[in-house]
């Protein structure tokens, strides 16, 4: 029986521990092709490269069962290049991550991890973005591997609805402390921006972007609530950004 073909990407770079853990998991399930950024691309969102060339190089040994390519572009670039040029056929699934840090709530908008998954969805490939709530480079991904495998197997068996990508966030706790898996809505939270203003040796101002994450959504059906209770959250994300509820109201405007 043929094994499914799985594309793996991320935004932390091809050498990040998170993607290595994800490769370990999905290699047990299917044939794997990895196309990931050569270096960190966190916070790139859905940026694509249009004003310069893209470069890719195979970094896995010839005898390796996993094909691995390093790409000079963004996470979205990686997925575009993989599906249209580097893979032997259209993949059965794309998994992105495992991200070092949360991509819950509004963070999905900024996330390169989720943009890789969303790009796959746009290309007609079922896709999942995985994130662990631990920003450290040496984060422990082993505790989450069984859950990642279970979710991936379910996606392959049951399918993901057309036009939908799954945003999966995993608490950084021991496996025994995970309370289960909850399908949720995205919490209505936001960042309060703060800039650390400094001067360079020439007296010119420059800024470091910092900020605070603020969640005023008290709903118990949100990803933030689930994660705070040590549940794994799954949010089905649509890439059709149409605000359908606003169409009727806007049609009442006078454009004459």
Locate each region found by the language model.
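A cross-family phosphate/adenosyl-ligand binding-site feature
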Residues: 2-9, 17-85, 89-90
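Electrostatically charged, flexible surface regions
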Residues: 142-256
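Short acidic, Gly/Ser-rich segments with clustered Asp/Glu that frequently serve as metal-coordination loops
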Residues: 12-20, 201-202, 209
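Short, Asp-centered acidic motifs that coordinate Mg2+ and/or phosphate
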Residues: 93
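Alpha-helix C-terminal capping segments
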Residues: 82-88, 115-126
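Glycine/threonine-rich flexible loop motifs
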Residues: 102-111
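Glycine-rich phosphate/pyrophosphate-binding loops
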Residues: 121-143
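Short beta-strand segments
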Residues: 9, 35-37, 96-99, 130-131, ...
């Amino acid at each position: 029986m043929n094994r499914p073909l799985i594309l793996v990407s991320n935004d932390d770079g091809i050498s990040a521990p998170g993607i290595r853990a994800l490769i370990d998991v999905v290699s047990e399930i299917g044939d794997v092709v990895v196309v990931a950024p050569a270096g960190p691309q966190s916070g790139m969102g859905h940026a694509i490269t249009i004003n310069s060339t893209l470069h890719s190089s195979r970094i896995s040994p010839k005898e390796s069962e996993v094909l691995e390519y390093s790409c000079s572009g963004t996470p979205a670039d990686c997925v575009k290049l993989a599906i249209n040029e580097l893979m032997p056929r259209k993949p059965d699934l794309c998994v992105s991550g495992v991200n070092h840090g949360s991509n819950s709530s509004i963070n999905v908008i900024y996330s390169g991890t989720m943009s890789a998954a969303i790009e796959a969805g746009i290309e007609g490939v079922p896709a999942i973005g995985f994130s662990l709530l631990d920003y450290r480079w040496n984060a422990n991904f082993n505790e989450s591997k069984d859950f990642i495998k279970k979710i991936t197997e379910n996606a392959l068996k049951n399918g993901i609805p057309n036009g939908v990508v799954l945003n999966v966030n995993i608490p950084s706790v021991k496996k025994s402390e995970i309370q289960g898996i909850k399908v949720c809505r995205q919490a209505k939270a936001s960042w309060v921006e703060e800039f650390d203003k400094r001067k360079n040796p020439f007296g010119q101002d420059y800024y470091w972007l910092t900020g605070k994450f603020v969640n005023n959504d008290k709903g118990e059906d949100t990803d933030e609530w689930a994660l705070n209770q040590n549940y794994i959250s799954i949010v089905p994300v649509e890439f059709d950004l149409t605000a359908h509820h606003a169409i009727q109201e806007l049609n009442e405007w006078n454009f004459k």
